[in-house]
């Protein structure tokens, strides 16, 4: 008799995706982040759902409803901080997941990669709208500054911004629609994740060598389920340490002041996970140019498969490309740091240098280095 997990219409989908899935025998812990992202998404949806039961999306009561959640709701404080710091864990896993894809050439599977880039954009949009909901000073001014960037679009810019705001400034209508979208998008993300997995399972996973591993596959369960559980335990430990010991470490103290349209905070900045893009935006003195650089800094991931000039897929055996990759990582960390600094010398000039280096590495240096490596190997 056939096992029910292999014959049942629903169970066999789960079986083929998580149990009997043939997986390369040599994938490292860098392949853990996909499952960690799935767990992050589940955690965010669950904590968010319970927070939404007590939150009110009205300018008069939003800030107080957060206070009410933290003080009066049973374990409301842990829900709130698990949700806020869960977003940080989500982005740490996201950036490591994308970095792994860049290093090991996972972008060669273009459909999976492109859906992943769209997912990245959607998660960023969701996180931005979520940051507005507590209606603190940084929520309000962050929303004002970032939505105002759309006014740089020629001809339709101003109308577009007012349409998004639902008025002539960030107000009640803006908060209500941001809450609606923030609630809806994670479910759309879940559907997109399913498509992402569907395309991945069409080709199978890549592996650290970048060489096809069709002759050496092992079942996902129990080998990689147990390996993913180890990664999960480490992530949960880090998240709980943050939530229980320093829940506000990654937040902004200005967000403990209720939103006041008449008083601008001294330094308006987004959450840490957007600082690299914010630094690129600020490094260009022209508004439209800055907005374009901001969008292109992430959209550039779409063209990565076109810039792949190497005869080898992975960077595992390409020391020159490895040096450039780690230079790119260092550059992104520099941009993140500069994004949190005020716009004055030397931070402004260093941000411009880091922005130029970021685009140069991806568009010019990496493809050229790959060609040099091909030549050195006489390919």
Swiss-Prot record:
GO cellular component: mitochondrial inner membrane; respiratory chain complex III
Cofactor descriptive note: Binds 2 heme b groups non-covalently.
Annotated residues for binding of heme b b566: 97, 196
Transmembrane segments: 33-53, 77-98, 113-133, 178-198, 226-246, 288-308, 320-340, 347-367
GO biological process: mitochondrial electron transport, ubiquinol to cytochrome c
Location in or out of the cell: Mitochondrion inner membrane
Function: Component of the ubiquinol-cytochrome c reductase complex (complex III or cytochrome b-c1 complex) that is part of the mitochondrial respiratory chain. The b-c1 complex mediates electron transfer from ubiquinol to cytochrome c. Contributes to the generation of a proton gradient across the mitochondrial membrane that is then used for ATP synthesis.
Miscellaneous field: Heme 1 (or BL or b562) is low-potential and absorbs at about 562 nm, and heme 2 (or BH or b566) is high-potential and absorbs at about 566 nm.
Subunit structure: The cytochrome bc1 complex contains 11 subunits: 3 respiratory subunits (MT-CYB, CYC1 and UQCRFS1), 2 core proteins (UQCRC1 and UQCRC2) and 6 low-molecular weight proteins (UQCRH/QCR6, UQCRB/QCR7, UQCRQ/QCR8, UQCR10/QCR9, UQCR11/QCR10 and a cleavage product of UQCRFS1). This cytochrome bc1 complex then forms a dimer.
Protein's UniProt name: Cytochrome b
Annotated gene: MT-CYB
């Amino acid at each position: 008799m056939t096992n029910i997990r292999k014959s049942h219409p629903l169970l066999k989908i789960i079986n083929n995706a998580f149990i009997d899935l043939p997986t390369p025998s040599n994938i490292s812990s860098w392949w853990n982040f996909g499952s960690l992202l799935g767990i992050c998404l589940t955690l965010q949806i669950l904590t968010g759902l319970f927070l939404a039961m007590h939150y009110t999306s009205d300018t008069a009561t939003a800030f107080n409803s957060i206070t009410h959640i933290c003080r009066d709701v049973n374990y409301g404080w842990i829900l709130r901080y698990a949700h806020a710091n869960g977003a940080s864990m989500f982005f740490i896993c996201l950036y490591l997941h994308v970095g792994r894809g860049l290093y090991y050439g996972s972008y060669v599977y273009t459909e999976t990669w492109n859906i992943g880039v769209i997912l990245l954009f959607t998660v960023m949009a969701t996180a931005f709208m979520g940051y507005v909901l507590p209606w603190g000073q940084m929520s309000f001014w962050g929303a004002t500054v970032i939505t105002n960037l759309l006014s740089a679009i020629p001809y339709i810019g101003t109308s577009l911004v007012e349409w998004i705001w639902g008025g002539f400034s960030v107000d009640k209508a803006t908060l209500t629609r941001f809450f609606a979208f923030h609630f809806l998008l994670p479910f759309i993300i879940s559907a997109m994740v399913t498509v992402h997995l569907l395309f991945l399972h069409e080709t199978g996973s890549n592996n650290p060598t970048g060489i096809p591993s069709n002759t050496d596959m092992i079942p996902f369960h129990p080998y990689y389920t147990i390996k993913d559980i180890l990664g999960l335990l480490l992530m949960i430990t880090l998240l709980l340490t943050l939530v229980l010991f320093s829940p506000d470490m990654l937040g902004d103290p200005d967000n403990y002041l209720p939103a006041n349209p008449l008083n601008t905070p001294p330094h308006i900045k987004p959450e840490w996970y957007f600082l690299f893009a914010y630094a690129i935006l600020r490094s260009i003195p022209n508004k439209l140019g800055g907005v374009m650089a901001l969008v292109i800094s992430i959209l550039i991931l779409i063209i990565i498969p076109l810039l792949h000039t190497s005869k080898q897929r992975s960077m595992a055996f390409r020391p020159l490309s490895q040096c450039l990759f780690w230079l790119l990582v260092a550059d992104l960390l520099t941009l993140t740091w500069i994004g949190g600094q005020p716009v004055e010398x030397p931070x402004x000039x260093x941000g411009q240098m880091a922005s130029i280096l970021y685009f140069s590495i991806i568009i010019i240096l990496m493809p050229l280095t790959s060609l040099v490596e091909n030549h050195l190997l006489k390919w």
